[in-house]
Amino acid sequence: MYGGNTMNNNQNNKPIIGITMGDPFGNGPEITIKTLADFSLYERCRPIVIGDTTAMEYAADVAKIVSNINLKINPVSRVSDAKFEPGIIDVYDLGLLKRVEISGTPEEHKPFGVGPSILGGEASFRYVEKVINLAMKREVDATVTNSFSKEAINMAGHHYSGHTEVYADYTKTKNYCMMLAYKDFRVAHVSTHVSLREACDRVKKARVLEVIHMANNAMKKIGIEKPKIGIAGLNPHCGENGMFGTEEIEEIQPAIDEALREGINIPEGAPTPPDTVFSKALGGWYDIVVVMYHDQGHIPLKVKGFVYNKKEKHWDAVEGINVTLGLPIIRVSVDHGTGYGHAGDGMANELSLANAVDFAIKLSND
């Protein structure tokens, strides 16, 4: 389904990874600098950043001062002009960000700390639009996205609830879902960016079965021959035989039964209570868990992947990735937000982006 290794006949067999810069006023530019400062990455892929030279140059200056990272920015207007050399960050420069456009921010001051803005929303949306276009034209083998602000893109007139929905719309994909992963702990979502009330209404047999299929296929793509899939219930104690809700009986179990008839490996043959399914997954019993709504999957992943330092008031670790399943192109993302409050200080943690690039490489080489 994915279209990988399409330009790899000119230069070598390393996949070209298009990385969006994210919101120019967020943490995307600086974690991109830190990720691409690992020169070993260039032994496995050819990265190109989709964004604006102005923000990337500032982030490079900060990285040099704070972390002693010395990288050059190479603006290009075509993928074919990229150098793909360690120490040089190729930026597909859309030229959307002019620092002087920001009210009260002189040219010499950092272009950060603005928070959600029309300018940041418009720019970050256009980066995503461009990288999707490049992937659909097979000019890049995979896409990796830094964070944008949902509020900011909507302020700019782009009415989407997140990257996943943008990708689905622009690739004309009807059936898709979000998968989160932290190392070997993985979850696939039946619903994501909707209210909890609506999320309950979306737990239907057809949708649950659809996500089971996508989860099963995703695990096979990364080399797991017979994936073991856990299915989280929706209600406390999986509804206790209908006492606390009937979704397990009426929707989830019928989906599981059909999946079992198709030969999909669901060890229990039934939904597992949400308060125990993740402990079993962390113990290695499942390769992936199908969850019923956003926070049911996000909370356990972030409890494992995020480590907060209360003394220093920053994140010591921000690990985990977001993958959109069901698309005709590869899309992997960081699993955190824009970090407006600390953006530009050079302290943002790049682990999630590094993980995302690694996973994109793995999918590209499939």
Tell where the protein language model's regions lie, with residue ranges.
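Flexible loop/hinge segments that line or gate small-molecule binding clefts
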Residues: 158-186, 192-195
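Active-site glycine-rich loop that binds ribose-phosphate moieties when present
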Residues: 165-174, 196-220
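Contiguous, glycine/small-aliphatic-enriched amphipathic segments in soluble metabolic enzymes
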Residues: 2-163, 208-230, 234-322, 328-366
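Substrate-binding rim/cap in mid-to-C-terminal beta-strand-loop elements of soluble/periplasmic
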Residues: 190, 325
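Well-ordered beta-strand positions
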Residues: 180-181, 322-324
